[in-house]
Amino acid sequence: GHEIRYTYICHVLTKNINLKIMKKNLRNVLVLSLGLITTIASAQWSASSNTWIDNTNSDDRSGFTRSTVTLDMSGVHISGDHYWNTDGTTSQGLYEAYVSSDVMGFGTLTLGRQDLSFGSGVLVSSSNWGANRYTTDGMDFSMSLSGININAGTMGGINTDVNYINASGEFAGVSINALMIDNQDVKSNAYDLGYSMMNGDLNLSYTMADDGYDTEMTRMGVAYNVFENLSVHGHMTQYEGESAVGTVFNAPMSSMSEGLSDGVMPHLANGQEAMSYGLSYDLGDIAFSYTMHNVSETDGDAEVDYTDLSLSYQLNDNCTLGYRSWKIDDTDYTFITVGIGL
């Protein structure tokens, strides 16, 4: 009788222990699941697709589409590109991937691959129109100190052989931006100064830059808001320095390195200068801009004329249609673009 009671008690105790273990495991699973669901629910994602159609030769068009998916979650940012060409080929690539964290309230530390842009974009800038990506792998520490925004970091991973510091601020209508880069002891810099007056209707700008290879750039500009939707602008840009005449300004991390394919005027060479002037008209859903460039040699007679015409139409909240045309002397280049965002 004692053995039966002892066996029964052991069986009951074992059953209760197993039941408690199962309940504990189930609770842990539920907690983890709830945390995962909460994390996913709090994540923000977006998607966009841009199509470029080269319409220069209407009998032989070509083009490609880039689709980008972006995910932001708890300080983590991941963005990837998928490319589809009209010839049927496809490819994929990582656009951005970084993690950001607050540093005891002093600033923000970011590690990973980023698409950076500083000041006027002479040395470091993103592509706002074209398909090229200008990303760097490294770390960035940003902070604000008495109205001055400071970024300092590396562009060659976590090693310090390629590093930069950028400072920017705005005071009483005056804006400044100073960027200095040290690329394995090759030191480049760019300084931007802007002044706004007449309640922001008249804006003056001045930029000085050195690519670290003895080619220097100077640009002066003015922009004026004729009325709410119409503005006119003009710039004079000159390249000079101790480098050999014909040496192109070196800025591989700037969209100006590719120029027209990224929708901007490209960097020129030592001994060249450009006069640019144009207008832009924005009605909200419809936007139009037209700019003329004249490129000449400082000590020569050679001249090249560029014209840049851009037209865009906001079809709906998610889709924008665009048309862009360049004319270089007597040669025309035209593109049709379609942008979709979610």
Label each PLM-derived region with a short phrase.
Residues L116-L123, A172-S175, P252-D262:
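Flexible, solvent-exposed coil segments and beta strand-coil junctions
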Residues N132, V162, M265-M275:
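Outer-membrane beta-barrel signature, preferentially recognizing the C-terminal barrel domain
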Residues Y213-A251:
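Long, well-ordered mid-to-C-terminal structural blocks that present hydrophobic/aromatic surfaces
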Residues G63, S127-A131, Y191, V248-S254, ...:
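Flexible, surface-exposed loop regions and adjacent strand-edge segments
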Residues Y8, M155-G157, L179-I181:
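Solvent-exposed, low-complexity segments and loops of surface/extracellular structural proteins
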Residues S243-P266, D299-A302:
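Solvent-exposed loop segments that connect transmembrane elements
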Residues Y8-I9, I17, I21-F118, V122-S125, ...:
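Beta-barrel outer-membrane channel/assembly domains of diderm bacteria
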